[in-house]
Swiss-Prot record:
Protein name (record): DNA-directed RNA polymerase subunit beta''
Cofactor: how bound: Binds 1 Zn(2+) ion per subunit.
General function of this protein: DNA-dependent RNA polymerase catalyzes the transcription of DNA into RNA using the four ribonucleoside triphosphates as substrates.
Cofactor: Zn(2+)
Annotated residues for binding of Zn(2+): C252, C321, C328, C331
Assembly and oligomerization: In plastids the minimal PEP RNA polymerase catalytic core is composed of four subunits: alpha, beta, beta', and beta''. When a (nuclear-encoded) sigma factor is associated with the core the holoenzyme is formed, which can initiate transcription.
Catalyzed reaction equations: RNA(n) + a ribonucleoside 5'-triphosphate = RNA(n+1) + diphosphate
GO biological process: DNA-templated transcription
TM ranges: none
EC number annotated for this UniProt entry: 2.7.7.6
This protein's record includes keyword Transcription: yes
Length: 1372
């Protein structure tokens, strides 16, 4: 954009000399001239960034109004020229670069080569996938460069290009999709699909590409939706933790600060701008002070510091601020909104929370690059000349396999690599850093332009990696062979199951062959290594009967038919089987010769098991007329203990059952419907309640509750008056059985067995003599005659008759109708059935009389016979023959059917080795197409059993045409068994054993590999959350507990390494290094506490604990805590900043510092000493420091504590304000605890005040009461620090009530009323005869602004005394 002089009103900027703020890409001469006047005309392209800098400069120099005008003018200018030039996007503007075709061809070639390497077993499946993805990513990046070059050189004024380039509309990655290629897509699991979309939107997508494209698009939409919710919740938690951080002081007076370091190039960026120096910055060699302590660092000062090459500056920070429960202005520095020192009362906590939470939605899919290390941080170095490589004496390297499966070496030290030319010219020198990869070896001869190394810059952020697994699927059927190099070992896991793991990188081969799966119980009928023809029988399975019996053939269903063998049968030949139809289905009865009827409990055609009831005899002889009481006669009847009374109680021993009848009506109606009285004698057919009649005569008992009639009991019998109290007492309550001839009372003797009860009637106490019915229970139940037909080895089948009583001794049956006391059951006695062996209930026609039907129980052995099948991929064709006919009698072990597995093609059979007599489940036939015969022109160079890949030499000038194993060598002819190698990385789990047979599609192994987490939502938001919630990561890195020197030891038992660190005092600490973990340090190196020993995410709690423990051993408690916290704080700030930076989001450090300050402000008391604190309590560090100072002054023992790192949620719940905590989460728990502890909420934060509905103590609501309180406190200003009332007044909690006094010579202490009501004020005034209008006497008023008594006022002592008595006045 080239502004013309008439389109921008420059008059206003002519006379002002200015500075520019913000790091800028504008040329230096432009910057210099912008800050001078008058402005000159510059012909520069100004893009989005240039515009930003101009606006920032205008705002800094000329204020808001002028800047708004300038912005408006620039906008008009832009629109004017866009209109004149007719800038718009049309399809012709999308120009595809010619290089695209060439780049795609190159990529295809690379991928074909990779696929070939994979086929030859040189790289693993994971390495292939990584290489493919990296190839496409690189192609995409090269295509972007081609697009840029194409537009810049051929069509710089192209509309699409101008819009994307200037930042007006779209960006380069969108243009890439329009004219380059759409690129790689992710599937819903976030994994990258290795098939890229080669077309762009102008060319149009194929159907496949369209589907894959939709996959990625859908994922984008879903992720955006999820991100919004996650980001919102993160913001809410952040606001909650920091809402009470308000700038309350001007200067806390601290001398501490944090160190801000310059980057590798010596730049600070905006890290220093707006901060205050905690220590003066001095240029060492000149003794020149660049900025004094407690002075602001603006852009110019920052540039001077950079120019003086000062590596680090100590600045003040919210992290080190010592203001109580807030931040002071000097530690916070500039408010970023207006680039000046922050005002008092600014709610910096909420600003910080919003600044961190808001970009959460932007932490999105900016990257799709998973494999390898991203190209930005690594540099490939090529040789510039031809010569030999010299590593030098300092070089230490170890073998390394790159993620693409290239064998290389990794440098363990920094050294210089030289390429020494053969012609004696100057050598090429390359600086190799620790961790760089070398693709050449020492003394190797290299040509010009050979890749020598991949240099990894030291500053590269450690990418977070995760363990992932991938299955290796077999592409062909055959036999598995291990390579020697694999060295598998057995690993037993916690559950005790054994798995095999590869200890080294090596190949698993599958040698081709036709594998047959044998059905269970099939046995091979052919010898190993014998030749078979098509259709020949390979194996045979025999189906035999276990017990023998009579054969029944059923109709076939689906692909199998059923053969049933009747092993045992039992017919109930005494009984006729009778069926009758009812509306609820068919009911079957068994009728005996004496016409007693059993009800059949199992329907004919059903299957039953042992112990089930077949039939039940309902015996009318044991049916009562009414309800009543059951008693077992003593010394006779007994029952078996039953777990449940559902089916009654089995009779153990026969005897007499006694039945005392009574009638019980359950009513549940209003008492007003009762038509008789309690204790009344009634006749039968009497109406007891409306519409309810008694069936028998007897005495009535009425049960009622709350005027609701519950039940009415009628007990039959005879009433006898009785006045003997002993007799009445004896038969009280439930009553007693009285035997025949037993004396009941003086003039009463039992003629037969009766039941006696004493009852209260209107005529006084009487004896009720109740009749007893006797039922005789036989000793054993009658069992009908059975006819049993049984095989010798067959299971037993029988019936058992049992008698069951429905009620136990003393049970009361509440009923009007009669009940059954006893039932006889026929129960099946047999073995426990299995799915193959079941008991069936059948009806059969009687052999003598065709009209009669009998019940028969049979035990059936059911065998399923498979139909013939045609061969498929894993099975040969089968042929099944039945060896029996319907009705045949077979013996135990006889063969019922045979199934033969037939061979599909001509070949040689091989049987696998039998292990521990395990049955053979698969056999393999080696066919002609599984081998290749190769004639040789000269003597062979290979031996039998050797495994080869394509291109290996068999003899001079005879390369192998295939992969496989050499089977035979005869007369210069080689036969190779075709195979397929699969590369398996170390530590992978092997799913197959050596020489095992596998089908196509079986899993051979599970590769374990590390992959970088993708830097999208999976990496962004959850990572921020993980850091701010201070989560303990899974599989965290091993940290060093105390400083010392590292040595390594090998543990034979677990086959793992142990790192041993020996400290200065000779103490040794052991750290087991788990399998798959990489050591981050080398042997002999000195390591500090808290440093990483292995790779992996750091557990921040562990880090704080170890740092504190180490510092505690050398420094005082307070100093150690401060220093340990500072280190963890600095790490947290850096980590959070890294996540945002990786997504291109800029957040000022001070915002993150405010949040981190809240997370690290608390300590946990370990030993309270002589303080009033409690062990385990979480307390602010500042508070403990004060308490310990007091203890020191009184020579008491101080509190001992450990610093604690709290996640934002935990910190919010542990805040001083219970109102704020309760409104966040776990309301009930927080309020309950606050109530139990009797907490006070001083309403210091914003949230508490909003909830109570008061003015918030920030912004204009923040009153600067500090000075007034100081003057009021007089000679003891320190009491304000601890005095809650002081705080309350400072924040204007509520208007206090003051007393206006007449003028006086001397000052008096302040008097405050304890919040009286209007009526109380009025009453007090009138009682003391005070008028509101008077000025010479004290008048009680509610103040408007004044909150203290003026110094020239005095109080009448009598008035004070009476006010104090009434409790209306307190003395402060």
């Amino acid at each position: 954009m080239t502004p013309s002089s008439n389109s921008v009103k420059t008059s206003r900027f002519n006379k002002v000399r200015t500075d520019i703020i913000g790091d800028t890409d504008l040329p230096n001469n432009l910057i210099k001239s912008l800050s001078k006047s008058p402005p000159h005309f510059y012909n520069h392209i100004i893009d989005k960034k240039g515009l930003r800098d101009i606006i920032a400069w205008a705002y800094k120099s000329h204020g808001i109004a002028a800047t708004a005008e300038l912005a408006d003018d620039i906008k008009d200018l832009g629109f004017k020229y866009a209109t004149v030039a007719a800038v718009s996007i049309s399809i012709d503007d999308l120009k595809i670069p010619k290089e695209k075709k060439f780049l795609l061809e190159q990529a295809e070639e690379q991928i074909t080569a990779t696929e070939e390497r994979y086929r030859l077993g040189e790289i693993t499946e994971v390495e292939r996938h990584t290489k493919v993805i990296d190839t496409w990513t690189e192609t995409n990046e090269r295509l972007v460069l081609a697009i840029k070059k194409n537009f810049n050189e051929n069509d710089p004024l192209n509309s699409v290009w101008m819009m994307a380039n200037s930042g007006a509309r779209g960006n380069i990655s969108q243009v890439r999709q329009l004219v380059g290629m759409r690129g790689l897509m992710a599937n819903p699991q976030g994994e990258i699909i290795d098939l890229p979309i080669r077309a762009n939107f102008k060319e149009g997508l194929t159907v496949t590409e369209y589907v894959i494209s939709s996959y990625g698009a859908r994922k984008g939409l879903v992720d955006t939706a999820l991100r919004t919710a996650d980001s919102g919740y993160l913001t809410r938690r952040l606001v909650d933790v920091a809402q009470d951080v308000i700038v309350r002081e001007d200067d806390c007076g601290t001398e501490r600060g944090i160190v801000v370091e310059a980057d590798e190039k010596g730049n600070y960026g905006t890290k220093l701008v707006g901060r205050l120096a905690a220590q003066s910055v001095v240029v060492d060699n000149e003794n020149r002070v660049l900025v004094r302590r407690n002075r602001e660092i603006d852009l110019i000062t920052a540039c001077r510091i950079e120019a003086a090459d000062i590596p680090s500056v100590i600045v003040r920070s919210p992290l080190t601020c010592e203001a109580a429960r807030s931040v002071c202005r000097k530690c916070y520095g500039w408010a970023l909104a207006h680039n000046a020192l922050v005002d008092l009362g600014e709610a910096v906590g909420i600003i910080a929370a919003q600044s961190i939470g808001e970009p959460g939605t932007q932490l999105t899919m900016r990257t799709f690059h998973t494999g390898g290390v991203s190209t930005a941080e690594t540099g490939l170095v090529r040789s510039t000349l031809e010569g030999s490589i010299i590593f030098g004496s300092k070089a230490r390297v170890r073998p390394y396999r790159t993620p693409h499966g290239v064998e290389a070496q990794q440098a363990e030290t920094d050294f210089v690599l030289q390429v020494k030319p053969n012609n004696g010219k100057k050598s090429q020198k390359v600086d190799i850093t620790n961790g760089s990869l070398l693709f050449v070896s020492d003394s190797q001869e290299v040509a010009s332009d050979t890749i020598l190394a991949q240099i990894i810059s030291g500053s590269s952020v450690k990418k977070s990696v995760e363990k992932a697994t991938k299955d290796v699927i077999c592409d062909l059927a055959g036999q598995v062979r291990y390579d020697e190099a694999l060295q598998p070992k057995e690993v037993i896991d916690r559950q005790g199951s054994a798995t095999h793991k590869a200890t080294r990188l090596g190949r698993v081969w599958v040698l081709s062959g036709d594998v047959y799966n044998l059905p269970p119980n099939a046995k091979p009928v052919i010898q190993g290594n014998s030749k078979v023809e098509e259709g020949e029988v390979l194996a045979e399975s025999r189906l035999s009967s276990e017990h023998g019996g009579v054969v029944r053939l059923r109709e076939s269903t689906g692909d199998s038919r059923e053969v049933q063998i009747v092993t045992t049968s039992m017919t109930l030949k005494d009984f006729k089987l009778l069926g009758e139809s009812t509306h609820s289905g068919e009911i079957w009865h068994l009728e005996a010769k004496d016409t007693t009827r059993y009800l059949l409990k199992t329907q004919p055609g059903s299957k039953i098991g042992n112990g089930e009831v077949i039939a039940e005899l309902a015996d009318e002889r044991f049916r009562t007329k009414t309800g009543g009481l059951v008693k077992y006669a003593p010394g006779g009847l007994s029952i078996k203990k039953a777990r449940s009374a559902k089916n009654g109680y089995e009779v153990n021993k026969g005897g007499t059952l006694l039945w005392i009848p009574q009638e019980t009506h359950e009513i549940n109606k209003d008492i007003s419907l009762l038509m008789i009285e309690d204790g009344q004698w009634i006749e039968d057919k009497t109406e007891v309640v409306k519409d309810i009649f008694s069936q028998i005569a007897g005495i009535v008992t009425v049960t009622q509750k709350n005027d609701i009639l519950r039940e009415i009991t009628v007990r039959p019998g005879t009433l006898y008056p009785c006045n003997e109290s002993k007799v009445i007492e004896r038969f009280k309550g439930e009553g007693l059985l009285v035997d025949e001839e037993e004396i009941i009372s003086k003039n009463l003797k039992a003629e037969k067995r009766v039941f006696v009860q004493s009852v209260e009637t209107s005529e006084g106490p009487q004896l009720l003599i109740r009749p007893v019915e006797e039922y005789t229970i036989p000793e054993v139940a009658h069992l009908p005659e059975l006819a049993i037909v049984k095989q010798n080895s067959g299971p037993y089948l029988g019936l058992k008759a049992t008698q069951r009583l429905n009620f136990k001794d003393g049970e009361l049956i509440k009923s009007v109708e009669g009940v059954e006391l006893l039932k006889t059951q026929l129960i099946l006695e047999t073995f426990d059935t299995t799915p193959q062996m079941t008991v069936d209930v059948e009806k059969v026609t009687d052999k003598r009389s065709k009209t009669l039907e009998r019940l028969q129980l049979v035990i059936l052995e059911t065998l399923l016979v498979r139909r013939d099948t045609i061969s498929d991929a894993s099975h040969g064709s089968t042929h099944t023959e039945l060896q029996v006919n319907d009705g045949d009698l077979v013996k135990s072990g006889d063969v019922v059917a045979t199934t033969q597995i037939l061979c599909k093609e001509v070949g040689i059979v091989q049987l696998p080795k039998q292990i521990d007599n395990e049955p053979i489940r698969r056999i393999i036939v080696e066919r002609d197409q599984d081998t290749m015969t190769i004639p040789l022109g000269s003597a062979p160079l290979v031996s039998v059993g050797q495994r080869l890949v394509d291109g290996d030499l068999l003899a001079e000038n005879d390369p192998s045409p295939c992969c496989g194993q050499v089977e035979t060598i005869k007369n210069n002819t080689i036969i190779i068994r075709i195979g397929r190698p699969y590369m398996i990385s170390s530590d992978s789990t092997l799913h197959v054993k050596d020489r095992e047979l596998v089908q196509r599609g079986d899993s051979l192994a599970l590769l374990v590999f590390e992959r970088q987490k993708t830097g999208d939502i999976v990496q962004g938001l959850p990572r921020i959350e993980e850091l701010l919630e201070a989560r303990r990561p899974r599989d965290s890195a091993v940290l060093c507990k105390q400083p010392g020197v590292l040595t390594l030891r090998h543990d034979e038992e677990t086959d793992s390494s142990i790192a041993v660190i020996k400290s200065a005092n000779g103490e040794e600490t052991e750290y087991p290094i788990l399998l798959g973990r990489n050591l981050m340090v080398s042997v002999g190196q000195h390591i500090k506490a808290g440093e990483l020993l292995t790779d992996g995410p750091i557990n921040p709690h562990e880090l704080l604990e170890y740092l504190f423990a180490d510092l505690r051993s050398r420094k005082p408690l307070m100093e150690a805590a401060r220093e340990a916290i500072a280190k963890v704080q600095s790490r947290l700030v850096t980590e959070v900043q890294n996540v945002y930076k990786s997504q291109g989001v800029t957040i000022h450090n001070k915002h993150i510092e405010v949040i981190v300050r809240q997370m690290t402000s608390k300590v946990r008391i370990e030993d309270a000493g002589e303080t009033t604190l409690l062990p385990g309590e979480l307390i602010e560090l500042r508070h403990v420091e004060k308490v310990n100072k007091a203890m020191f002054m009184t020579s008491s023992s101080p509190a001992v504590f450990i610093p604690e790192l709290l996640g934002i949620t935990k910190a919010s719940l542990n805040t001083d304000s219970f109102i704020s905590a309760a409104s966040f989460q776990e309301t009930t728990r927080v309020l309950t605890e606050a109530a139990i502890e009797g907490k006070t909420d001083y309403l210091r934060g914003l949230k508490e005040n909003v909830i109570i509905g008061r003015l918030i103590p920030a912004g204009t609501g923040f009153s600067g009461f500090e000075e007034e309180l100081r003057s009021e406190a007089g000679p003891h200003p320190d009491i304000l620090d601890e005095d809650p009332a002081g705080y309350r007044r400072m924040q204007n909690l509520r208007p206090d009530y003051t007393v206006d006094m007449p003028a006086a010579a001397s000052a008096s202490p302040a008097a405050l009323l304890d919040d009286p009501s209007d009526d109380e004020l009025e009453a007090t005034r009138s009682r003391h005869g005070i008028e509101v209008t008077t000025s010479n006497t004290a008048a009680f008023t509610r103040p408007v602004i004044v909150n203290k008594i003026m110094e020239d006022q005095i109080l009448d002592p009598d008035i004070i005394a009476s006010l104090q008595e009434e409790g209306l006045l307190t003395r402060e």
